[in-house]
Amino acid sequence: VEQQLKTKGKKKEELPELDTLGELLTGFQVGRLKYSEALESYVRSKFSVEIQGNYIMILAYLGDHYEEERKRTIPALTALLKDTISKKCQILDFLVFKSCLFIFPCEGEEAVLVKRFQKTILTRICNDSMASFGWIRFTGLSQLAESAATLQGCMDWCIPLGNGVIIHYPRIKQLQTSPLSYPVDIENQMKTAICMANPTKLQETFRDFQSYFRKGALYDPKKIKESYLRFI
């Protein structure tokens, strides 16, 4: 019995001291925390949070504008999310991908939450920001890091779809794309403009090149990136 009590005491001592819910989420994000029944009980008692519950993650990709958008757009976005989607929304920095993550319990129908985000937040933010957004539902905070990586791998879809559309996983995997033919004629026009040293023509031709991928057909973002690399 004495040995059992010592073992239980040890287990309690091994539990991390978590002062905020943000610390809990960061712990799972960076791999510092692992699921255990003891941790689950501790978190439920301290934060009234279910580690094994269903959660929504919104990824806000800021890219090269990270520093500026982090200060300017993210505070307003956080307030909007708490007002219209979930008061339990927490924010994490995802520096390796120049992004921020918003995480909250999935309370209610996911389809309703997505629609609300699209109508009340995305349209407003996109008018004044260059951020693009991804959305994923996951079960268990131990899946937080993997879910962020999954969204990261999908964000190239913003290239053909634009920032006004949320990249919703796994729906995004169901999109059908059209074959992409490289615009050789536009490339030849660009070569001519370079030879003529005509900056106006250069700008016009590059705009034509950009417009080529937005003429109604949906192309694989990887193919578009390959075309840009070839063109440049």
Residue spans for each PLM region:
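Interdomain helical linkers/hinges and coiled-coil/dimerization scaffolds
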Residues: 1-113, 135-159, 163-197, 207-211, ...
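Extended Gly/Ser/Thr-rich low-complexity repeat segments
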Residues: 111-119, 123-126
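Helix-capping and short linker residues that terminate individual alpha-solenoid repeat units
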Residues: 214-215
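Conserved short beta-strand edge segments in small beta-sheet-based binding/regulatory domains
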Residues: 123-139
